[in-house]
Design a protein with these regions (language model features):
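Dinucleotide-binding Rossmann-like beta1-alpha1 core, especially the glycine-rich loop
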Residues: 49-134, 138, 287-289
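N-terminal Rossmann-like FAD-binding beta1-loop-alpha1 element of flavoenzymes
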Residues: 6-33
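Helical element adjacent to the flavin cofactor pocket in flavoenzyme catalytic cores
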Residues: 150-206, 215
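Short, well-ordered coil/turn residues at beta-beta hairpins
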Residues: 12, 198, 211-212
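Helix-loop-beta segment of a Rossmann-like dinucleotide-binding subdomain
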Residues: 87-101, 126-174, 266-270, 325-332
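Active-site substrate-recognition segment that forms the wall
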Residues: 19-26, 36, 47-51, 86-92, ...
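C-terminal catalytic lobe of FAD-dependent flavoproteins
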Residues: 292-373
Length: 373
């Protein structure tokens, strides 16, 4: 007989749900992971793969710390997944750069990084603004139009698809139950007692985690939560494999383990339209060629668009229901970067039954000025 009662149900099998489900199952909670399937919007299958720190958390030091914490957790998570599943995530953390193609961009970037460092306070933020010959030593093949770059030691990249596969394999390997093609339709909520209907089955658990990406906007109110997320489109281009080695990723260009270059990615307000546009693709390619002129010799072999999961202020939303204790939600636009904290820090909080007080700034109550006051 199909099991119908669990310690926790996670709705959404993308990077966020899979990392949390993996963390919960590893903590010993019998966990069910429900995923809608290929017809859903799935950011986790179309992203760029950066494990990125240096552009995160301006004006939100709690997010800066959370992101950096995740970059620190990543090597542990990658090693553990490799050991448990045999799947390598391709993690490399050689540091990373943001390239500036004009003096104006360089000046603005310098101010941005200085402010980020001030806001980091005692936590600190190591970075350098690098110019000229030094920049060209660090990244051979830089184009003459590159004026300089910001560098931090924390940045890196990984394969998002291998990560997703490793999390799923690690989850089921630890005894978790994964149910694909199972869109949650009906549900009922009471404190520490939830039931959801998916694929003709009804499941119950004292904990439920909403990690359905853009689907959270509809699901959250049913569990006494808010997840006002909207789509933001990003387009990505991929070149053929090349033997030229890019020693570290930049904000918009990274080399996969297999040798392809990924070029990206745009930030567009296009609703739920998953189309691609030649103008945006041209801009992405032009900037890549100005950054590294040798890229012009490579053929493009693939291109796609995907939808980010964006909160109104661009920061993650982590929340717990006051009305229905035991219900949680997790939403973010950096699910690769944050996989480390989702599996190793957030999942243990959910397993313990409550988010730590330090997570309060991530609550969706920040959008509701009266209740936040
Ligand atoms: C172009 C682009 C580039 C990006 N680059 C990076 C990057 O370099 N680094 C980084 O860290 N992040 C990046 N991201 C962001 C990252 O991809 C997302 O943060 C992450 O994928 C979000 O994961 P998720 O699990 O919340 O959402 P999704 O991947 O969208 O998964 C949600 C899942 O929920 C399921 N679902 C929805 N509704 C229901 C329902 N009712 N019942 C059951 N299941 C449901 C869907 O089937 C889906 O699988 C990028 C995103 C885009 C679009």
């Amino acid at each position: 007989m199909t099991r119908q009662s669990f310690d926790a149900i996670v709705i959404g099998g993308g990077l966020v749900g899979a990392a949390i489900a993996y963390g919960l199952q590893r903590q010993g909670l019998a966990t069910l992971l429900l995923d809608e399937g290929d017809i859903a919007f799935r950011a986790s299958r179309g992203n760029f793969g950066l494990v990125w720190v240096q552009s995160k958390g301006l004006g939100a030091p709690h997010y800066q710390r959370w992101t950096r914490g995740s970059a620190q957790e990543w090597p542990k998570l990658a090693a553990e997944l490799k050991e448990r599943t045999g799947i390598g995530t391709g993690l490399q953390q050689p540091g990373g750069v943001h390239l500036c193609l004009s003096e104006e961009e360089f000046g603005k970037r310098g101010e941005y990084m200085a402010r980020l460092q001030r806001e980091a306070g005692n936590f600190g933020l190591e970075y350098r603004m690098v110019r000229g010959a030094e920049a060209r030593d660090m990244l051979p093949g830089l184009g003459p139009q590159v004026v300089g770059m910001s560098w931090t030691p924390y940045d890196g990249h990984a394969s998002p698809l291998y990560l997703l596969r490793a999390l799923h394999t690690g989850f089921t390997g630890a005894g978790g139950t994964y149910q694909p093609n199972a869109r949650v339709e009906g549900s009922s909520a009471a404190p520490n007692d939830f039931s959801v209907e998916a694929a003709g089955q009804r499941y119950r658990a004292p904990r439920v985690v909403l990690a359905a990406g853009l689907g959270n906007a509809d699901l959250a109110p049913r569990f006494g939560l808010e997840a006002p997320v909207r789509p933001e489109r990003g387009q990505i281009l991929v070149t053929e494999r090349t033997q030229t080695v890019l020693p570290m990723p930049t904000t918009t260009i990274r080399q996969t383990e297999e040798g392809s270059l990924m070029l990206g990615d745009s930030k567009e307000d296009a609703g739920f339209n998953l189309g691609q546009s030649p103008e945006v693709m041209r801009k992405i390619a032009q900037r890549a060629v100005l950054s590294f002129p040798w890229i012009a010799n490579l053929n493009l072999v693939r291109a796609w668009s995907a939808l980010r999961v964006m909160a109104p202020d661009g920061l993650p939303i982590y929340d717990q229901s006051e009305r229905f204790p035991g219900a949680f939600t997790a939403n973010c636009h950096s699910g690769v970067t944050l996989a480390g904290t989702h599996a190793n820090r957030l999942a243990p909080m959910i397993a313990a039954g409550a988010l730590e007080p330090g997570m309060a700034p991530f609550s969706a109550r920040r959008f509701n000025v009266r209740s936040a006051a």
